[in-house]
């Protein structure tokens, strides 16, 4: 943790169940602003649910969640919308509208959520497309984009409102190693240049090693390790050591 760096996200005793299935059980952790946290764990251990709790798509059954000093578990309506404006979300799927061009997909949130004139929207779209390496592709339809291009487009969309916190759900899923590494580099560049806090759910241990300042390891809905990659490698928990040592 960087001294003096306030936490961007805090989970305090958070639990979440779906019926009789306990997905998260009394989970507590935080990530300092401007750092990268990678969340590792087997399938079904609550990783993606954690992201949905951060963006308030789900509510915890117990515990508190703070986003940039806002206790989101106490917010509703306009308060939730205000917090969500601080967060970008890179889904596993790029979440693009198939009937719109790439430009139209990226311009849409600015048109709906801001009062920016078209000229300024054009400038922002062009700038972000340049940042993700799609500067010449804005007239393309989503069906014309390769898997790597769709992932870049999804990242561009997540960045359109200049989020302070960027959530990424399996950013390397379905990509070859070279393309996955390129996506990781884009995320790291964003972190370095804009001091964006990254929270990345991944099964890709190599990606976690590239990205993470700290790693959170979940197993059966509980935190079994939380620390640097080196600390996880030397954890007393055998499952945590295995998860950081090989792809799962």
Protein language model annotation of sequence segments:
Residues 55:
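Helix-to-loop junction immediately C-terminal to a conserved catalytic motif
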Residues 71, 118-136:
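Conserved ABC ATPase "signature" region
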Residues 141-145, 149:
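Conserved ABC ATPase signature
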Residues 160-164:
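A short, proline-enriched helix->beta-strand linker immediately N-terminal to the Walker B motif
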Residues 166-169:
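Catalytic Walker B motif of ABC-type/P-loop ATPase nucleotide-binding domains
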Residues 177-179:
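Helix N-cap at the start of a conserved alpha-helix in ABC-type nucleotide-binding domains
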